[in-house]
Amino acid sequence: MENRILIIGDELFGEQGEAANRFAEILLCREANRPVQFSINAPAPQTLQQLYDRASADIIGKKAGRIIVGLGLKELKRGGKDYHGVFASYQKLADEILNKTLVPVHFLTVPEDMFPVAPSQLTALNDCIRGLQQKDEKRVKIFDFAAYVADFKEKQLERGKFGRSLYTEDGNPTSICNTFLALYLYDCVIKEMK
């Protein structure tokens, strides 16, 4: 369905998918005359491999008009794989989505603060995710949330405001971070829809 937005994500969207749900609510409130439906699978309990295995039912079968993907964090946190291994699974899923659909696909980068034990792993994973745009520059857009967060943090430091923590010490998003991501998604998606 042209007006259905499918969101597939992990803890990037919050412990219970708060950012995805807030984004849906913001879009419905701000665009009251736009017919839109949401299918939200965030946080997805499945691994990247399981999402790939079930892609025909859980992703392609949803018949979305737009797909937003925010994955990779859970796989890194789980351990056993570095960013190479995580991206191999991520890319396999991305290829499946791009080969079996004709709709716009948006891939989100993950802020480094969400994996404080090895932020360089997220930096490297994000660089790989950014490279996905080359697969189909008309359909694929990178929503660079990691860069957006870095810019926000820099502006906070310039102003001397330290009271707005986006993440806890162990990298979990705070309530303000979930709202921040929801607003960011709204801005990006509306820009793409117009």
Predicted regions and their residues:
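Oxyanion-hole/transition-state-stabilizing segment in secreted/luminal serine hydrolases
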Residues: 49-87, 106, 111-114
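Short, solvent-exposed loop/turn segments at secondary-structure boundaries
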Residues: 17-19, 79-84, 116-121
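Serine-esterase "nucleophile elbow" of acetyl-processing enzymes
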Residues: 1-44, 56-63
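Active-site segments of SGNH/GDSL-like serine hydrolases
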Residues: 70-74, 95-127
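Acidic/histidine-rich helix-loop elements
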Residues: 38-49, 77-82, 170
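Structural recognition of the beta-strand scaffold that forms the well-ordered cores
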Residues: 5-7, 37-40, 66-70, 104-109, ...
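Solvent-exposed loop/turn segments at secondary-structure junctions
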Residues: 11-14, 44-48, 73-77, 111-115, ...
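Catalytic His-Asp segment of secreted/periplasmic serine-dependent ester chemistry enzymes
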Residues: 114-194
